[in-house]
Regions:
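Terminal-proximal interaction/regulatory segments of ATP-powered molecular machines
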Residues: 53-146
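Short alpha-helical interface patches
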Residues: 13-24, 38, 42, 91, ...
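Hydrophobic residues on short alpha-helical segments
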Residues: 39-47, 63, 84
Length: 146
């Protein structure tokens, strides 16, 4: 389709690469739109850390920002147990990556979570959520790139 739109005589490797990137962004957008409101807010919280290059982030820090975003949008935050369950779901969807850390008996076990998709594609797909919650200062400059 890209080659046709550009009136190219033949399909090049660049057309194929850009076509794949476009399809991947569309799949990410569809996947995010299929999430419920709380899952989208959770993903937005993670994206805000990624915008500040603070990702991957510990699950407890992510939960704190998720609570803040819920408060901004007038929703009651769900439990941290809920968040852990849904982080696993977001990982299965390929939206986030999870690394389990074990610091032994003194440090305990915890998860660090990172965004596993292109930040701008995620922010674009979360446009309605961002409008509902408000624009976090960490993503303000990224949104101007959209």
């Amino acid at each position: 389709d890209l080659a046709h739109e550009e009136n190219a005589d033949k399909v090049t490797e660049d057309h194929v690469r850009r076509g794949r990137e476009l399809l991947q962004r569309e799949e990410v957008t569809q996947g995010i739109h299929g999430l419920n409101e709380h899952e989208q807010i959770l993903l937005y919280a993670l994206a805000s850390y990624s915008s500040d290059d603070l990702s991957p982030v510990r699950s407890r820090d992510l939960y704190h920002r998720y609570e803040q975003f819920c408060s901004h949008s007038g929703l009651d935050a769900l439990t941290s147990r809920w968040m852990h369950d849904h982080i696993d779901e977001l990982e299965m969807l390929g939206l986030v990556s999870v690394d389990k850390k074990n610091k032994g008996s003194s440090g305990g076990q915890y998860k660090v979570i990172g965004l596993d998709q292109e930040l701008l594609a995620v922010l674009n797909a979360l446009e309605d959520t961002i409008n509902q919650v408000g624009v976090h200062e960490s993503v303000q400059t990224k949104l101007t790139e959209l």
